[in-house]
């Protein structure tokens, strides 16, 4: 297809993009792409009759990632309100992807009551194939808080998935949360070299490297993330980088989001994500809107808000 920028692409253009077209459209957007995160297990959402995904698109998000999806029981995803992944994707005319976890291989359901089914979102080959079949536009590999996921687990999953599925999957990979037992990627106190791990992820086939956002994750500076983003872009030209505003700070006030957004922009990352730690399974619509305005200004934000059905 003709190359275009995601931030100015209409719905009919987005609908015809391949996985690698989408990747290129993000690169061409020059650091202004906003990704929302939709937590599915908490309930139907903030507004009756409207999914959180659609709400975030209406407030300026360019992409949405679905978290805690149960791929073994698709009816067990309250936040989708009975829809499949493909249905809101078609209705919103925007890229929708899936967050898959990479916990230790020995993880088992132990009979304890969990907030959500951990095994339903593990990055198995079967789940990846299901994401492809359900028309997910991208997959994000990581580890939710409390999962005990190591960056090495994520490298191994990246290598396995890209070897089997290739460019059928637009693959994001990294570690921006779950930092209790092992520090996140880019933390100066991590017991591993961030650049070495990033190179391993890129060599394994990752299309985009996920990093914590300065100002949201404790101990993470703009200078440090800027340094690793530069490494991502130079290690293999065309590889993207994403900063992730989470660690519950996504539930702060819009003024805080504005300040962090400017730090995120300074890192040089291509995608800027905001977490789901608000009320009802996503950050507040006002915070999504503020992130969008701070990163790309009002004209492109208003375009995204007004072009849901274009």
Predicted ranges, named:
Residues 76-86, 228, 266, 277-307:
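C-terminal helical cap(s) of enzyme catalytic domains, especially alpha/beta-barrels
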Residues 97-100, 172-174, 242-243:
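Short beta-strand elements of ligand-binding domains
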Residues 32-41, 67-73, 113-114, 244-247:
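Short, basic, glycine/proline-bearing loop/turn elements
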């Amino acid at each position: 297809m003709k190359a275009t920028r995601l931030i100015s692409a209409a719905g009919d253009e987005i609908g015809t993009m391949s996985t690698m077209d989408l990747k290129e459209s993000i690169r061409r957007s020059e650091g202004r792409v906003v990704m929302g995160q939709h937590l599915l297990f908490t309930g139907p959402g903030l507004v009756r009759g409207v999914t959180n995904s659609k709400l975030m698109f209406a407030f300026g998000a360019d992409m949405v990632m679905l978290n805690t999806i149960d791929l073994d029981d698709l009816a067990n995803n309250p936040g989708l309100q009975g829809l499949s992944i493909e249905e809101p994707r078609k209705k919103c005319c925007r890229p929708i992807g899936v967050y898959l976890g990479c916990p230790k291989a020995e993880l088992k359901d132990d009979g304890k009551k969990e907030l959500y089914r951990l095994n339903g979102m593990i990055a198995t080959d079967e789940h990846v194939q299901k994401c492809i079949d359900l028309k997910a536009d991208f997959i994000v590999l990581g580890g939710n808080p409390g999962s005990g996921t190591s960056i090495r687990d994520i490298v191994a999953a990246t290598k396995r998935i890209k070897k089997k599925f290739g460019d059928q999957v637009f693959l994001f990979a990294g570690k921006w949360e779950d930092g209790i037992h092992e520090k996140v990627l880019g933390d100066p106190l991590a017991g591993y070299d961030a650049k070495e791990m990033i190179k391993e992820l890129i060599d394994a086939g990752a299309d985009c490297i996920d990093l914590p956002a300065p100002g949201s994750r404790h101990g993470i500076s703009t200078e440090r993330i800027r340094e690793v983003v530069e490494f991502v872009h130079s290690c293999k030209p065309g590889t993207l980088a994403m900063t992730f505003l989470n660690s519950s700070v996504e539930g702060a006030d819009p003024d805080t989001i504005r300040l962090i957004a400017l730090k995120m922009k300074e890192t040089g990352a291509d995608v800027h994500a905001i977490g789901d730690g608000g009320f009802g399974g996503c950050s507040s619509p006002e915070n999504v809107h503020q992130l969008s305005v701070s990163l790309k200004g009002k004209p492109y934000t208003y375009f995204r808000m007004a072009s849901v059905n274009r």
